[in-house]
Amino acid sequence: MKPIRLYPLVLFIAMSFLSVELTAQARFYPAARSGGSYMHNFYFPPSPSATPWAPDWSPDSEWIAVAMQGSIWKVDPDTGRAYELTYNDAYHSSPDWSPDGKWIIYTADYEHQRIQLEILNLESGESHILTDDQAIYTDPVFSPDGSQVAYVSTNPSGYFNVYVRAISGGKWVGEPIAISRDNEYGSNRLYFGSGDMHITPAWLPDGNELLIVSNRNVPLGSGNVLRVPAVEDGILQATTVLAEQTLYRTRPDVSIDGRRFVYTSTSGS
């Protein structure tokens, strides 16, 4: 009996699996019109793991909120003991503590299709949704007085913009205010596309301004760190405070006195 050559069959099967994999990847976060897999890997929260992620101090400095294994936890920095605060079928990340210590807002990723905002009542231990659609919401952060939340969303057109929305008692009050809007660079940038993005808002202590990262009119990287008023179309009054070929994880954080900010840098790499 002559041996049968399986090489073409193996090649066909391998190519079939590759095709299925690429098709599945193409379906990730369909609401996003920019970024692609590069953004998914370096900007969105990581896949579930045992590694703590996105730490945030409680206002009294007694606890640290972290994302870990798809849930939000609070960690005692003295003992290292962690207590799970949230759990459901979504992947939770990016916790941010309200200034009064009563709430934690966070993101909920549903099977790499959409990312929503949810909020935890620390007194009752119950969470409820703040957004429920097919868009992407990231980087939620309370204003210094707790009356507003800044966040990033792909609503309504699929590009990443910064919004501010009033909140009270764990519920929205009023409509979102667009700090930035869609803007075209004019040509397709490697990894980043032609549509500008505006991400990772951080409040200044007076609650009147934000630092954001944006590649608005920037040819390389995820952009510069901009200082913008926290008002509608504040991006039109933006001032560049750091010009660097940044990456998604720059994530500026402003000091309590408002005189400095820390960030992740590509300088020297």
Question: Model-derived features: where do they sit?
Answer:
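Positively charged n-region of N-terminal signal peptides that target proteins for export
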Residues: 1-6
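Bacterial N-terminal signal peptides
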Residues: 8-19
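Beta-strand initiation motifs
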Residues: 79-83, 124-128, 170-177, 232-238
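Periplasm-facing N-terminal accessory domains of Gram-negative outer-membrane beta-barrel systems
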Residues: 58-63, 67, 74-86, 99, ...
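A flexible loop/linker signature enriched in serine peptidases of the S9 family
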Residues: 25-28, 47-49, 67-73, 87-92, ...
